[in-house]
């Protein structure tokens, strides 16, 4: 398929999850409706991951595509119908007998993802070392956490041009080259092992305290208990605390055989979140999630959340923007050359600010223009004018004067306050 055909085929999947309730806004949101180029709901401005959208198949397709043409093809399977790679995530089901007064019942726990190791006891131990609220048990807070992190850490629009908004053929080609490069140079999947198993791993290397390396000659010099003691000295590359013998650890091949992590320490160095499904990107001695690795390589548009492959883009408020996406967050009008106000780190045009966000003057009860001076006390504001900031009793101008605030009213003296009480 040529580039022109790829561009024509692009879409954002606007029907997916349509009408799903927002878990954050509840009844305030009319239901999920994807904005035509932002990755948010048009109704409540929350992301798709904040809505009750069933994404398991879509997420499995996304991760499957990420692993395509990599050494991790054992983690994917291609559907017979369309050849689309699907992520073969490992689901773990545990059954625990529960003693009751008269009989024994079976309690079943399903983990929506578990490390793909043959030893289920090791996988179970790995899960127990994660914070409870981050264990991906089906129907739990942890499962919801995993769902959000899949969306946040591995955006589909960071690897698939068809998920982006109106890329040019040149941008499509650049993105494909970028994805190919990070797959070959940075992408990896953690492996759960017992620390002692690392003694036999690597090209004539063994792990010593503090992550130092020792050659086989040094190993050969060790004898008896001394050698065994040395082999049990492992420290976490993240927290630097020791690894307990028998506890599972995570090994990242791109980081090298001299580095191990506690399960709860295998996190992105930028956002400090657990690396979802142990999928990592390695750069300059640090672990990253997909999003923050890409952020370290390319500018990201604060409007559409996509990486910028164009040579021309704008910078405003310490953020990057496609030229066509530096728009009002409320009405989508382009802001180039226009007055705007930042509201929760989002640019809003002056008319929308006055209509939707401006504070109301306690004096005249009109919205206060963003360019006009105002007086603010607690949650109350006034135009800083002789017509508005007045004593609520005698109408004396209070600009530059002492005043007594009482529930949205202001007084110039105790006497005026008593007269209004």
UniProtKB/Swiss-Prot annotation:
Gene Ontology CC annotations of this record: cytoplasm; cytosol; focal adhesion; plasma membrane; protein-containing complex
Localization, UniProt: Cytoplasm; Cell junction, Focal adhesion
Region (Disordered): 133-164
GO BP annotations listed: negative regulation of cell population proliferation
Domain called PET: residue spans: 92-199
Chief location: cytoplasm
All residue ranges annotated as the LIM zinc-binding domain in the record: 234-297, 299-359, 362-421
GO molecular function, one term: zinc ion binding
Biased composition (Basic and acidic residues): 155-164
Keywords, sorted A to Z: Cell junction, Cytoplasm, LIM domain, Metal-binding, Repeat, Zinc
Free-text domain note: The N-terminal and the C-terminal halves of the protein can associate with each other, thereby hindering interactions with ZYX.
Protein name as catalogued: Testin
